Amino acid sequence: MGTVSSRRSWWPLPLPLLLLLLLGPAGARAQEDEDGDYEELVLALRSEEDGLADAPEHGATATFHRCAKDPWRLPGTYVVVLKEETHRSQSERTARRLQAQAARRGYLTKILHVFHHLLPGFLVKMSGDLLELALKLPHVDYIEEDSSVFAQSIPWNLERITPARYRADEYQPPKGGSLVEVYLLDTSIQSDHREIEGRVMVTDFESVPEEDGTRFHRQASKCDSHGTHLAGVVSGRDAGVAKGAGLRSLRVLNCQGKGTVSGTLIGLEFIRKSQLVQPVGPLVVLLPLAGGYSRVFNAACQRLARAGVVLVTAAGNFRDDACLYSPASAPEVITVGATNAQDQPVTLGTLGTNFGRCVDLFAPGEDIIGASSDCSTCFVSRSGTSQAAAHVAGIAAMMLSAEPELTLAELRQRLIHFSAKDVINEAWFPEDQRVLTPNLVAALPPSTHRAGWQLFCRTVWSAHSGPTRMATAVARCAQDEELLSCSSFSRSGKRRGERIEAQGGKRVCRAHNAFGGEGVYAIARCCLLPQVNCSVHTAPPAGASMGTRVHCHQQGHVLTGCSSHWEVEDLGTHKPPVLRPRGQPNQCVGHREASIHASCCHAPGLECKVKEHGIPAPQEQVIVACEDGWTLTGCSPLPGTSHVLGAYAVDNTCVVRSRDVSTTGSTSKEAVAAVAICCRSRHLVQASQELQ
């Protein structure tokens, strides 16, 4: 694969002069020296110029996107993404049409790559003056300006060469990831290093930009430190996680650790094409890099994930919200933050690991010993979220080797389930990010453990809604997960509840902001449950003093969660939906002016029960947890006056947060309780016991 050239300036030229430059010997040679072969453009001019002269103009319904971080932008190179239903042949036809219409206006363009296997579209070098024209082309969905991505490692001590300190008998995981292929998109790799010799195949793929301040590319062998180190972390003989995993290297970062979104997209398409041509076992793609938020980068990751590929990425080293970066913000990617030997967030000078709701878990990322490219027996220590992501890629390879049939959703749930819980000091994170950031550090499961019997659930937070009264927030589960309950949270306490609704054939959790509120979060409880069938039963406001009630009336269905929403601004003594331990077991009860929603599910052997923990007066936090063997599916507050900020699940614990009444001037003595719905599958438990 050829190298993607860096950006250059473009000038509009009169059409006769343009043709002279293209067709004249001297002009052709000069242009080829700078920008390559323009034969395709000449053919496009000859074949399409006349036919498109009278083509009708289309209203620009497509959108334009660019990186929010100006220094990372690469104007002059654009990814043109076509609509989902576009036939693959239209990619090349649309590209030729753009070239022909640009030439009519006196502009040079160059098609750098046409995507066929990853997404419909193409990569083009052109003047920004042509964007309006390109956005009006038929089939165009959106256009994104190219931008930079960066390796996410910080050298801890480059001068020190350290021998590996691990003993072989300390780490003998089952199968060692031998059934899994790991693709590493990074710098090149020193494949003859003793840590990885015979385990790595360096492909001929290369798509990197020129280095800053230069007009050339250094040989890959001269700058393979970052990739070599990460390859050793993933599958090194002494210091690797998955010692048996095979690894393939694609070069998308230059010697300065810098690449482009477009170059990485071409690398992902290379992987997809390889997968189609020669299907193999489970694939893990390690993306130890980060750039600004990119719609097209995230879309490409989604495509690859839905094709069965597991993608693991670095959260980023900017001490910032990971949702502002790609591919860390892609929901289908497993995003990894970095911790040190004390399980605390990694600090890198004035920066450090990224955090927030887009991070799935953390992993070791400080002072990590691995292979050094200084010599074939050298080792070096490095730090960063790249190293953390490499650990999780190795763990993923181990799990997939033990259970090759695992889906991405199942793998993610297992990574979360087996992580060390509540070991990170949350005070390191900004206050508004603490509740959103998972307190999880990755760990391998017990070597003899098969978790097929376990009911797995995780908590998914939405983005923060706007502050307007009608603003809403939506939380979604992954493709193979089922939404079992929905809750909401507002730091101001001003919200209008939440509900489960259908959207695009999937259940989603929608939370509603209230007048005077600062915004709200929707919180989905997403679970893996075979053969599950769920529905929502709703009761409108009862208008009676006894409150609104709704229950699961279908035979065999059990209550997995309750939610409510209301239109009035202040319910006063609002009582949100709860499952009470006394009375009807499958019933949600709420305020008479609220609509109450019961999430009712049926699955083989599914059984649920309620746990409630209350305190006699309002406190800032009340919790209740499910016992071992049971999984939290629903979390609600009781009673839920204006002091209650909301409820959410942390691992297997239901947390209800309230405002400190001492700061509000309130004299309320109303009790507050956390109500948890705990479920398990007798069918899965029995299957596990039979295996034992």
Curated annotation (Swiss-Prot):
Boundaries of every Peptidase S8 domain copy: 155-444
Residues the record lists as Phosphoserine modifications: S47, S688
Residue ranges annotated as propeptide in the record: 31-152
Compartmental location: Cytoplasm; Secreted; Endosome; Lysosome
Residue intervals of the Inhibitor I9 domain: 77-149
GO CC annotation: cell surface; cytoplasm; early endosome; endoplasmic reticulum; extracellular space; Golgi apparatus; late endosome; lysosome
Record comment: activity regulation: Its proteolytic activity is autoinhibited by the non-covalent binding of the propeptide to the catalytic domain. Inhibited by EGTA.
Disulfide links within the chain: C223-C255, C323-C358, C457-C527, C477-C526, C486-C509, C534-C601, C552-C600, C562-C588, C608-C679, C626-C678, C635-C654
C-terminal domain as annotated region, ranges: 450-692
MF annotations from Gene Ontology: apolipoprotein binding; low-density lipoprotein particle binding; serine-type endopeptidase activity; very-low-density lipoprotein particle binding
Range of residues in the leader sequence: 1-30
Disulfide bond in keyword set: yes
Keywords annotated in UniProt: Apoptosis, Autocatalytic cleavage, Calcium, Cholesterol metabolism, Cytoplasm, Disulfide bond, Endoplasmic reticulum, Endosome, Glycoprotein, Golgi apparatus, Hydrolase, Lipid metabolism, Lysosome, Phosphoprotein, Protease, Secreted, Serine protease, Signal, Steroid metabolism, Sterol metabolism, Sulfation, Zymogen
A Pfam family annotated for this UniProt entry: PCSK9_C1
Active site: D186, H226, S386
Top EC class of this enzyme: hydrolase
Sugar-modified residues: N533
Presence of keyword Protease: yes
Listed cofactors: Ca(2+)
SUPFAM superfamilies, per database record: Protease propeptides/inhibitors, Subtilisin-like
PTM annotation (Sulfotyrosine): residues: Y38
Family: Belongs to the peptidase S8 family.
Protein name per UniProt: Proprotein convertase subtilisin/kexin type 9
Native organism: Macaca mulatta
Gene encoding the protein: PCSK9
